[in-house]
Structures are given as C-alpha cells and as structure tokens.
C-alpha cells in the first residue's frame, strides 16, 4: 500500500471515528455538513446604556477542507469595542488537545478601504493537516462609550454548516429595554424566552438545537433570505455622548436628524461665490448645473470614519475648507 493510500485511509478512519462518537441525530446533521457547530454560546451583560460585556464560546468541528473557513477566528473592534480576553484550543479527531492558542498569536489588522477609521480586526487562521478536527475559542469583548445595538444571534454562519446547539443570553438592568426581531426562524428548532431577574433586569434567552445544514443552490435564494437569526436593539440608547430613542422609526429619525444640527452652515465667501456662479442663470436647471459643475471640480470623496463620524457628517464648513468629505458629508454640503 502506498504512503498516499495509507494517509487517505487514515483520514477516512478518523472521520468514521468522529461520526461514531456523535449522537445519531448529530450524525445526520454532520453527514451533509462541511463544518459542525458543536456548541456556541453568547452572553451579553449590559451594565448601563453605555457599557456592556460580551462573553462568547464557540466549538466547531471541521469535517473537510471545504469547511476550513469555519475554523478561523475573527473579532471586529473600534473605539467602542475592545477585545479583553481570548483563548483557543485545537483538538484532533481522537479528542486529544494538539495545542493551545494565545491572545498574543492573534493578528491585528487595521486594513480598510477608508482613508482613516478607528475600526480594526483581530484574526487567527487555524489550519490542521488532517480532518476532522475541532477548534474551541473563548473570548470577551468590552463595550464602552455607547451602545447603539447588540450582537446578533446567528447560529449558522455559512452554507453546509450544521448546528448541534447554540444559545444567546442578554441581560439589561432595570429601566432599560431591549427589543428583538426574529428572521427565518419559522419551522426551525429555535426558541426565544423572556424573563425578569431578581433585581428587575430584563433577560432574553435564545436557544437553537439540531439545525440541519443549508445547502447552497445555483440561482437559489441569498444568504440573507435563508439563514435564521435574531436581532437585538435597545429602545433608549447613548452613543458617543449622544442620547436617542429607537423604539420607533420616527424617534430614531429625529435622533439622526439631530446629528445634522449646525453642520450645514456655509461661510460668507462661499455664499458669495454661489451667487456669482448663478447670477446669469435664468432657470433652476441652469443654476443646479452651474453649482454641480463647480462642486464636481472642487470636491472629492474621501472616507473618514471615526467614532460617531460614521453616522454624523463632517461640517459643511470643513468640506468647503478642505474640499473633501464622505458620502454623507458631501450630501450635507450639497444641500445648498
């Protein structure tokens, strides 16, 4: 028997062993999967409108090469979110711990399509020469200076991925309210339970179990149309010292509109320039064309996303002075 054949046979034996160790129902799920979420837990503890701690544990078994992406770790951070703790463990098909993964091994990337942003990413690419193998990650994220939304419960992250069990728990102090919305959960083994803690806390718990893999089909529905998830959002919130209410679209729109207050003022020299450009125009269309042509020559799109700047536009005065702004900054400037 050749070395290649022995290696291939060993891989098949390991896969069979892995399946034999799984419960019957889990075997059914795994048989059509490239990766299997063995256990995923998320706990969100909100301490106030501006602070929270998110603790996550994810154990996933990679059944073949096509499921390898599920073995990697990613954590997005910014000036509001920071990774506090992390640990990982790689386990082979026999259930033996191969190695521990430390936080110092994570790669930090600040790569972005924006000119400047406070977003950054921690990631770890997990690779192992034989399948199946299991990887377990445990991490904690601290949120400060604002909470405009909470993590989404999404038990399945990719096509051909089964789920043995997944859970999500969020707790808010008395007086705060969290709303939720389910999507694509009908007919699936996903439950949402709401309760009140001993000190008046609002507690929401979501559980999912034995979710079969979703198979990608040519010209089939998109990821967003198929995958189950539960969204969570506060009613009243505070974000970068700006308080708002998103219990209704009307109230959230009023908060968004308040971010524009005082940011659409133009300098007197620029106002004079606009009058000069449109002085000889006889129709509104000619005026619009004159202003548009001038702004097209004197402004450029540049993405700068810092803090609440991801939602609040740069002032019209600064766009006039520098000649650049992002989409909302230029739109605000062009309201003239």
List PLM regions with ranges:
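Bacterial Sec-dependent N-terminal signal peptides
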Residues: 1-28
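Lumenal/extracellular ectodomains and adaptor appendage modules
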Residues: 27-167, 268
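Conserved structured core elements
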Residues: 52, 129, 162, 264-268, ...
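Cysteine-centered nucleophilic/redox motifs
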Residues: 58, 135, 168, 291, ...
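Conserved short loop/turn motifs at secondary-structure junctions
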Residues: 73-78, 153-157, 277, 310-324
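Generic beta-strand/beta-sheet core signal
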Residues: 91-93, 209, 330
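Second-shell loop/turn segments in exported
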Residues: 120-125, 260, 274-281, 316-325
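Secretory-pathway-linked proteins and extracytosolic
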Residues: 142-152, 158-160, 167-308
């Amino acid at each position: 028997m050749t070395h290649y054949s022995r290696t291939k046979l060993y891989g098949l034996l390991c896969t069979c062993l892995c399946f034999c160790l799984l419960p019957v129902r889990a075997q059914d799920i795994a048989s059509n999967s490239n990766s299997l979420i063995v256990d995923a837990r998320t706990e969100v503890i909100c301490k106030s409108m501006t602070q929270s701690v998110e603790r996550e544990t994810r154990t996933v078994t990679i059944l073949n090469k096509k499921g390898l992406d599920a073995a990697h770790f990613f954590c997005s951070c910014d000036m509001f979110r920071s990774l506090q703790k992390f640990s990982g463990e790689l386990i082979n098909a026999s259930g033996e711990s191969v190695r521990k993964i430390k936080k110092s091994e994570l790669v930090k990337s600040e790569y972005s399509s924006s000119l400047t942003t406070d977003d950054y990413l921690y990631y770890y690419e997990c690779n192992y020469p034989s399948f199946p193998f299991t990887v377990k990650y445990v991490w904690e994220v601290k949120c400060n200076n604002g909470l405009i939304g909470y993590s989404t419960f999404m038990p399945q992250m990719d096509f051909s991925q089964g789920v043995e069990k997944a859970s999500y728990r969020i707790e808010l102090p008395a007086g705060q309210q969290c709303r939720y919305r389910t999507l694509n959960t009908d007919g699936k083994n996903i439950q949402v339970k709401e309760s009140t803690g001993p000190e008046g806390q609002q507690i929401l718990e979501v559980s999912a179990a034995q979710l079969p893999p979703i198979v990608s089909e040519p010209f089939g529905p998109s990821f967003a149309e198929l995958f189950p998830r539960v969204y969570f959002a506060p009613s009243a919130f505070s974000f970068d010292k700006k308080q708002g209410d998103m219990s209704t679209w009307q109230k959230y729109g009023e908060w968004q509109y308040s971010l524009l207050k005082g940011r659409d003022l133009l300098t007197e020299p620029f106002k004079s320039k606009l009058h000069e450009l449109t002085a000889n125009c006889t129709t509104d269309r000619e005026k619009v064309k004159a202003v548009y042509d001038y702004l097209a020559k004197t402004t450029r799109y540049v993405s700068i996303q810092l803090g609440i700047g991801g939602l609040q536009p740069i002032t019209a005065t600064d766009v006039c002075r520098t000649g650049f702004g992002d989409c909302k900054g230029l739109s605000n400037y062009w309201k003239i």
